[in-house]
C-alpha cells in the first residue's frame, strides 16, 4: 500500500509540473502558443485545442495568428469535432483570404459539414448545408486538387 501511495504521489508531482500544465496556468499567450504548437506537432490535438481555445480571442492581428488559427481548425478536424472544425475553417477562410492555405481550408470546412450528414432516413438539414458548402467550394475552385 505504501509503494502504491508513493508511486501515486510521484506521478502527480511529475505530471503537475509538465510544460503543458505550466502553459495552461500561464497568463503569457506566447508560452501558451509555443506549447500548443508543440502539442499539435506531437499529434496531441486535444491538448493543443485546450491551449488554442485560451489564446484565440486575444491572438488576432499577431504575426503568428494565421498559423495559429490554421492549426486550431486542423486540431478540431483531426479530433473529429466537425461542427467546430467547419466553423473554424470558414472563419479562417474569411479572415485570411490571401493565405496559401485558403483552398484547403475552404475544402475542409465544406467537408466538415458532409461528415455531419446523417443516414437518409433522418433529418437532412446537415446534408443540405454540406451540399451547399461543397457546391460553393466547387464554384470558387473549379480546378482544385481536392476535386477528383
Language model features with spans:
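Acidic, polar-rich low-complexity tracts and alpha-helical solenoid repeat scaffolds
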Residues: 4-6, 13-148
Amino acid at each position: 500500500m505504501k509503494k502504491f501511495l508513493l508511486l501515486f504521489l510521484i506521478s502527480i508531482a511529475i505530471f503537475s509540473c509538465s510544460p503543458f500544465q505550466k502553459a495552461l496556468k500561464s497568463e503569457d499567450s506566447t508560452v501558451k502558443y509555443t506549447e500548443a504548437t508543440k502539442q499539435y506537432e506531437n499529434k496531441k490535438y486535444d491538448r493543443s485545442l485546450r491551449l488554442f481555445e485560451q489564446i484565440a480571442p486575444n491572438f488576432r492581428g499577431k504575426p503568428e495568428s494565421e498559423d495559429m488559427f490554421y492549426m486550431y481548425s486542423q486540431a478540431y478536424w483531426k479530433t473529429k469535432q466537425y461542427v467546430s472544425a467547419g466553423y473554424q475553417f470558414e472563419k479562417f477562410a474569411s479572415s485570411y483570404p490571401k493565405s496559401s492555405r485558403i483552398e484547403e481550408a475552404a475544402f475542409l470546412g465544406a467537408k466538415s459539414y458532409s461528415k455531419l450528414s446523417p443516414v437518409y432516413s433522418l433529418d437532412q438539414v446537415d446534408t443540405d448545408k454540406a451540399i451547399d458548402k461543397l457546391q460553393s467550394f466547387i464554384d470558387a475552385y473549379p480546378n482544385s486538387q481536392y476535386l477528383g
